[in-house]
């Protein structure tokens, strides 16, 4: 599992079309925008397990305290690895990550298996960008 954390002034995304046949149907393809979120670009890799979510949650808690965002955006992002988990496994781990994060934070979860356009306006402070790899 790999994550890229970006503290954004503004982040917007809009689903455009399915990237996977098995992608869930969406009730809306409207653009979603958040001001001052901590955006988590997350890649699920082969062999990743739910235990890794605990490590991710720990890092989210720490980063949340450091940068004081208004909430979180969890954004499935396959481009951080070339060792991707099968889509069904990735979708399930991302679902669990969204669920777990939602227990502690206000979170928006971008859809898995969709092409999405996005707008990212990042803060420029020293803690605005952070990458993590979870073994």
Region annotations inferred by a language model:
Residues 82-91, 121-125:
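Short glycine/threonine-rich loop-to-helix capping motif typified by GTGT followed
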Residues 10-12, 78-80, 111-116:
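Active-site-proximal loop/turn and secondary-structure-junction residues that shape catalytic pockets
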Residues 58, 62, 89-99:
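Alpha-helical scaffolding segments of alpha/beta enzyme cores, especially the outer helices
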Residues 9-67:
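Conserved mixed alpha/beta catalytic, RNA-binding, or beta-rich assembly cores of soluble enzyme
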Residues 94-135:
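Divalent-metal-activated hydrolytic enzyme cores
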Residues 1-14, 25, 33, 37, ...:
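Non-catalytic terminal extensions that flank enzyme cores
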Residues 52, 82, 86, 97-98, ...:
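Phosphate-backbone binding interfaces of nucleic-acid-interacting proteins
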Residues 68-84:
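Short glycine-rich, basic-tinged beta-strand/loop micro-motifs
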């Amino acid at each position: 599992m790999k994550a890229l954390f970006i503290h954004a002034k503004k982040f917007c995304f809009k689903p455009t079309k399915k990237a996977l046949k098995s992608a869930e149907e969406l009730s809306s393809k409207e653009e979603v925008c958040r001001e001052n979120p901590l955006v988590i670009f997350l890649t699920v890799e082969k062999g990743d397990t739910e235990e890794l979510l605990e490590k991710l949650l720990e890092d989210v808690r720490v980063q949340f305290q450091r940068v004081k965002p208004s909430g979180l955006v969890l954004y499935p992002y396959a481009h951080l690895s070339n060792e991707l988990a099968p889509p069904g496994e990735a979708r399930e781990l991302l679902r669990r990550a969204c669920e777990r994060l939602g227990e502690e934070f206000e979170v928006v979860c971008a859809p898995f298996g969709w092409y999405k356009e996005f707008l990212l306006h990042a803060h420029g402070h020293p803690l605005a960008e952070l990458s993590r790899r979870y073994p």
